[in-house]
Amino acid sequence: MTAQLQTSGNAKTVLVTGGAGYIGSHTVVELIENGYECVVVDNLSNSSYDSVARLEILTKHHIPFHKVDLCDREGLEKVFKEHEIDSVIHFAGLKAVGESTQIPLRYYHNNILGTLVLLELMQQYKVSKFVFSSSATVYGDATRFPDMIPIPEECPLGPTNPYGNTKYAIEKILNDLYNSDKASWKFSILRYFNPIGAHPSGLIGEDPLGIPNNLLPYMAQVAVGRREKLYIFGDDYDSRDGTPIRDYIHVVDLAKGHIAALKYLDAYNQKEGLCREWNLGSGKGSTVFEVYRAFCKASGIDLPYEVTGRRAGDVLNLTA
């Protein structure tokens, strides 16, 4: 089958770390549809090679894949040697807020060290364009400031959990690296909110290997009988129904945002480089109960649920 798959000739090659994962896989589709070639690196800790195979079916393109952990410098350098990388979109990393409060050292080691190894190799191989998958968790509890909901990019940062701290630390690293050599780097930092949904083909979507950390896949697993009930973490927040408010953005829209950010870097031709942050959200906040009721209505299933205590590190409102 691979021999029949297309390539795009002299197209620019983008290294997509975490490209077998939820957001990464959808972004690979958009990259190929926009004329880029992709190389996917993933350690498959929360995904499977099946998603890469599905991407090849979906795009009718051969997609080089390397099972490599970013902390493995030798393994990652082989990828840079084998492919002429033009730019990097960096998704790879641990990403569960609650879990990060339980195993913080693993989060700091994996997310920060992996990014450092990646940046060092980019510097060594003179790859200057970098789109970073950051998170709205870097803002922490924006309600502690007046007039900061919806959250603007200039909102003061203050993450409330180790996961958010790793994203904040990486943002600081990128700013420091840019300021050390402004002519050599172009950085797009994308702070996004809560991705949901799946590709319209139905071939790819959010299907984590373990217990889902996001609301929609958890509800889906309850609906098909893989989980007994939905757990709602807290109904005593100062919201319209007591549950936290989140900004849910469709994953395909989010993927298109990464393409826009990369094209912005491609077209940016100023003497100095760039290091800029953007929020990616829908601009509309919905409570957990509102999403729950919408899911039940759409599926025709009244999902069983149980309200438990608040999850460590969660905040009231994250809306773009």
Per-region residue spans from a language model:
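N-terminal Rossmann-like NAD(P)+-binding domain of SDR-like oxidoreductases, especially those catalyzing
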Residues: 1-198
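The catalytic Tyr-centered alpha-helix of NAD(P)H-dependent dehydrogenases
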Residues: 159-166, 208-215, 247-251
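Secondary-structure transition/hinge residues
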Residues: 126, 178, 182, 200, ...
